[in-house]
From Swiss-Prot:
Its EC number is 4.2.3.-, 2.5.1.29, 2.5.1.81. It comes from Penicillium brasilianum. Residues 411-420 have a biased composition (Basic and acidic residues). The conserved DDXXD motifs as well as the NSE/DTE motif are important for the catalytic activity, presumably through binding to Mg(2+). Mg(2+) 4 binds at D492, D496. It catalyses: isopentenyl diphosphate + (2E,6E)-farnesyl diphosphate = (2E,6E,10E)-geranylgeranyl diphosphate + diphosphate; isopentenyl diphosphate + (2E,6E,10E)-geranylgeranyl diphosphate = (2E,6E,10E,14E)-geranylfarnesyl diphosphate + diphosphate. Its cofactor is Mg(2+). Residues 371-390, 398-420 are annotated as: Disordered. Residues 343-732 are annotated as: Prenyltransferase. Residues 1-342 are annotated as: Terpene cyclase. The gene is PbSS. Mg(2+) 2 binds at D105, D109. Substrate binds at D105, D109, R193, L194, S195, E196, F242, N243, K244, E245, F246, R334, Y335. This is Sesterbrasiliatriene synthase PbSS.
C-alpha cells in the first residue's frame, strides 16, 4: 500500500498484529488505519448512549431489559477504524450517526412489526417534511427527536453530502422493511443485498465525514469494482452478525425476515454452518481482491486532474472503511455476544429446510453429507440447479417417492405407452390432460422476480388506512394489480423494443416475443379469475373498464410514435390518465367496492394527480438520471421515439424542430437505436430550450397540488401518516 503514502492527514497506519489480543476471528485482507481522534469519538459515544437510554425510557417506561451495543470495543472505536480520515470538526456528528445506526437497529429489532412501523413513520415524516417542504417538524418520540437534531446538524454542516447520506439511509430502511429471502438463490440474494445492507449508506456517511463531493456519475464510473468490495462488506456483516440475527428472529418468531447469506446457504443449499462460513469467507476474499485489483488498474489509467484526485480519495476511503469495519466486526461485542439464548444446534435446524428443492451453488461442491449421493450423478461435470439425495430428490428439484418420479406419475404410466417396443395407440384416445402452466408463466415469473420499488403495494396499504378493506380482498386486489402491472411491462418492452427492464435483460430476450406475448395474455386471464373471487359483483365491471382504459391509453402512445404525430399537452395528459393512471384508479375503485368504510371524492383526484406525477417524473428521469441509464439505457425514450413531456416542450420551443424529428422518425431500416451523438444533440437542445427547468416546474407544481389534495382527503377521512410519508417522498 505504499502508493497511498502521503494521502492522509488525521490518521496513522496500523498492523492488526499490534493489537493484543488479536481477534481470533479476523480474516480481512484489506488495509485499515486508526484515527488520531479516537478518544474524542469514545467520549461522544458515552454521552450519546446516556441520552439514548434516557429517551428510550421516556418513550416506553416499561422497557428495562434492552441492552445497546455501539461503537466502542475493548481495542478501540468504530469511527476510528471505519473513517480514520474524518475531518476533526465532524468527528462528533460522524460518531453520533454511527451509534444511531446501531442503537436504532437495537430498538426496532426488539419491537413487533406494528411498533416498528410507528417508530419509522414518526422519523420519516419529520425528515421528508424538511427535505421536500423545507419545514422542520418535531417527531413525537424522544429517540427520534435526538435523531433529527443530529441530522439537522449534518445538513447544516454540509447539506449536499448530507442529503445524499439521508436518502441512502432511507433506502436502506425501505429495503429492510420489504425484504424476505425465503426461496431465494444465493446469486439472487447477493444482487439484492447491496440495496438492503447499510454498505451504501456507510459510503455516503464517509463522503460527508471526509468532505468528499462527487457527482453520482463520477461515483458510478468506478462502481464496477467498488461494488464488489461493498458486496464483500455486506457478506462480512452477514458472517459476523449471523448468530445475533438468528437469535433475535428466533425470539421474535420472524425467521422469514432473516436477511443473511449464511442462512441462505444453509437453508437453500443444505450446507452446515461451518461449510457456509467457509464459502462466505471465500466470497468475501474474492470481493476484497476485486476492489484492490480494480483500484490498482484505475490508478494506472487515471490522470492528474482534480476530479481524479477527489475520486481517488473516494475509492481509498471505501477500501479503508471496509478494512476497518471488518476488523471492528471481528471482535465487537455487538456481534460476539454471551447473552444469546439460541445455540449452534438451534441454527442447524434450518439446514436443508426445503429438502425437495435443494440448490447447487456454482463454483462450490455440494455439502459433504451429500457427496456420496451425488457422485453417481456426476454433478461436477454438469451445471444443475439442484442435486439428488438418497431420499429421492432429483437433479431438477422434483421429489421422488420410493424411487418413482412424481412428474412421471402426473403424466401417466410411461410403460403403458409402449407395446412390443412400439408406441401404443392408446395415447390417441386417452382422456384430456391439462397442460402444466410452468412454461406459459415462465416469462411472467422472470419479470416478476426483478426487483422493483413495490410502490403500488405501499400505496394500497396507505389507502387501506382509510378504506379498511378486509385482508382476503386486499390480497386479491394486490394480486390483480401486480399481475396487470408486470404483464403490461412485458408487452411494453416488446412494443418499445426495449433491451433492459430494471437493469436486467427484458423477458423476450430469454423467451422470445411470441412466448412473452402469450405469457402476458395468460396472466390477463389469471387476473380475470382473481377478480371473480372478489365479493362485490361490480368489481368485474370496474376491472374491464380500467383494463380498457389501459389499452386505449397505450394505443395513443403507440399511434403517435408510429405516425410521428406530435400530440398536444392536453392529448398527452389524456394518454397518461388512461395508460399510467389506469392502475391507480383500478386499485382505488376495487378497494372502494370491497370497503365497508366511507370514501372521499377527493381520493380519485389524488390518485389521478399521482399517476400524472409518476409518468412525468419518469419522462424527466429517463433523460437526466444516471440510475435510469444503468437500468434502461442512455435516454431510451429517444430510441423509442416516445413523445414524452420533455420532447413535447422541446418541439414547441426550438427554432429547428426538423433537426429533432428527422433522426427520431426517419431512421435507416432496422435501426432501433439512435446514435449517441444524436441523443447528446437533443439533450443539449433541451437544455438550451429550458426543457428540464420546465419539467422540474411541472413536477413541483404537481407535488404541491398532490399535498394540497391530501389535506382535503384527510379532512374527510382522517390523518394518514403512511400516505403522507409516501407522497412527501415523491418530491425527493
Amino acid at each position: 500500500m505504499d502508493f497511498l503514502s502521503g494521502a492522509f492527514h488525521y490518521s496513522d497506519s496500523v498492523n492488526p498484529s499490534k493489537y493484543s489480543p488479536r481477534p481470533s476471528d479476523y480474516f480481512g485482507t484489506l488495509p485499515f488505519r486508526t484515527s488520531r481522534f479516537e478518544r474524542e469519538a469514545a467520549d461522544v459515544t458515552a454521552d450519546y448512549l446516556r441520552k439514548w437510554q434516557k429517551a428510550v425510557k421516556a418513550d416506553n417506561p416499561e422497557r428495562k431489559d434492552l441492552v445497546f451495543h455501539g461503537s466502542t470495543t475493548t481495542l478501540g472505536h468504530f469511527v476510528s477504524w471505519a473513517y480514520p480520515e474524518c475531518i476533526p470538526d465532524r468527528v462528533d456528528l460522524c460518531t453520533q450517526i454511527c451509534d444511531f445506526g446501531f442503537y436504532w437497529d437495537d430498538v426496532t429489532d426488539s419491537v413487533n412489526v406494528q411498533e416498528n412501523a410507528e417508530i419509522t413513520q414518526d422519523l420519516a415524516l419529520a425528515l421528508l417534511s424538511e427535505l421536500t417542504l423545507g419545514q422542520r417538524l418535531e417527531p413525537k418520540l424522544e429517540i427520534n427527536k435526538i435523531v433529527v437534531q443530529m441530522l439537522w446538524g449534518v445538513l447544516d454542516k454540509d447539506r449536499k453530502s448530507g442529503l445524499e447520506m439521508i436518502k441512502f439511509w432511507k433506502g436502506h430502511l425501505d429495503g429492510q422493511a420489504e425484504s424476505a429471502h425465503n426461496n431465494m438463490s444465493f446469486e439472487e440474494y447477493t444482487k439484492h443485498r447491496l440495496s438492503e445492507v447499510g454498505a451504501r449508506w456507510a459510503v455516503e456517511v464517509g463522503c460527508w465525514s471526509l468532505g468528499i463531493n462527487l457527482s453520482r456519475e463520477k461515483k458510478d464510473s468506478v462502481a464496477h469494482f467498488v461494488n464488489k468490495g461493498l458486496l464483500a462488506a455486506a457478506l462480512m456483516n452477514d458472517y459476523y452478525s449471523f448468530n445475533k440475527e438468528f437469535d433475535e428472529h428466533q425470539r421474535a418468531g420472524s425467521m422469514d425476515r432473516l436477511q443473511n447469506g449464511l442462512g441462505i446457504l444453509m437453508r437453500e443449499y443444505g450446507y452446515t454452518e461451518t461449510e457456509a462460513r467457509s464459502i462466505l469467507r471465500e466470497e468475501i476474499r474474492k470481493g476484497e481482491r476485486a476492489i484492490m485489483d480494480g483500484y490498482i488498474a484505475w490508478r494506472e489509467s487515471a490522470d492528474s486532474s482534480s476530479e481524479s484526485h477527489e475520486l481517488n480519495r473516494y475509492i481509498v476511503m471505501i477500501i479503508l472503511m471496509i478494512g476497518g469495519i471488518t476488523f471492528w466486526s471481528s471482535h465487537a461485542s455487538r456481534y460476539h455476544r454471551d447473552d444469546l439464548i439460541t445455540t449452534a444446534g438451534d441454527r442447524a435446524m434450518i439446514v436443508g429446510k426445503f429438502q425437495c428443492s435443494m440448490r447447487l451453488l456454482d463454483g462450490y461442491p455440494p455439502p459433504n453429507r451429500w457427496k456420496s449421493a451425488t457422485s453417481s450423478n456426476d454433478i461436477s461435470g454438469r451445471k444443475r440447479k439442484s442435486w439428488s439425495d438418497s431420499n429421492g430428490v432429483d437433479t431438477h428439484g422434483a421429489c421422488y417417492t420410493n424411487g418413482s418420479s412424481n412428474r412421471a406419475k402426473r403424466n401417466g404410466t410411461e410403460a403403458g405407452h409402449k407395446a412390443n417396443g412400439h408406441d401404443s395407440m392408446d395415447i390417441y384416445t386417452a382422456p384430456f390432460l391439462k397442460a402444466p402452466s410452468e412454461v406459459c408463466e415462465a416469462p411472467y415469473e422472470y419479470i416478476n422476480s426483478l426487483q422493483g420499488k413495490n410502490m403500488r403495494n405501499k400505496f394500497m396499504d396507505a389507502l387501506n388506512h382509510w378504506l379498511c378493506v378486509p385482508a382476503p380482498s386486499m390480497q386479491i386486489i394486490k394480486n390483480i394489480v401486480q399481475m396487470l402491472h408486470n404483464s403490461s411491462l412485458m408487452l411494453d418492452d416488446i412494443e418499445d423494443e426495449s433491451p433492459l427492464r430494471r437493469g436486467q435483460p427484458v423477458a423476450h430476450t430469454f423467451y422470445g416475443i411470441s412466448q412473452t406475448i402469450n405469457s402476458a395474455n395468460f396472466v390477463y386471464v389469471k387476473s380475470v379469475k382473481e377478480t371473480s373471487r372478489l365479493k362485490n359483483p361490480i368489481c368485474m365491471e370496474i376491472f374491464t373498464d380500467e383494463l380498457s382504459n389501459l389499452h386505449t391509453g397505450q394505443s395513443l402512445d403507440l399511434y403517435w410514435r408510429y405516425h410521428g404525430r406530435c400530440p398536444s399537452i392536453n392529448e398527452y395528459i389524456m394518454m397518461v390518465d388512461n395508460k399510467t393512471g389506469g392502475l391507480f384508479r383500478l386499485m382505488l375503485r376495487l378497494m372502494e367496492a370491497e370497503s365497508p368504510a366511507a370514501s372521499s371524492a377527493s381520493l380519485v383526484k389524488l390518485l389521478t394527480l399521482t399517476g400524472r406525477y409518476y409518468q412525468i417524473r419518469d419522462d424527466y428521469l429517463n433523460l437526466t438520471s444516471v440510475e435510469y441509464t444503468s437500468k434502461k439505457g442512455f435516454c431510451e425514450d429517444l430510441d423509442e421515439g416516445k413523445f414524452s413531456l420533455p420532447l413535447l416542450h422541446l418541439l414547441n420551443h426550438t427554432r429547428h424542430p426538423d433537426r429533432i424529428t428527422a433522426p427520431l422518425f426517419n431512421r435507416a431500416s432496422g435501426a432501433r437505436s439512435l446514435a449517441r451523438e444524436v441523443k447528446v444533440h437533443i439533450i443539449q437542445a433541451m437544455d438550451e430550450a429550458g426543457t428540464f427547468e420546465y419539467a422540474q416546474g411541472v413536477l413541483k407544481y404537481l407535488h404541491e397540488e398532490i399535498m394540497r389534495t391530501l389535506d382535503e382527503v384527510e379532512a374527510d377521512l382522517g390523518r394518514n401518516t403512511e400516505a403522507r410519508i409516501l407522497l412527501l417522498g415523491l418530491g425527493l
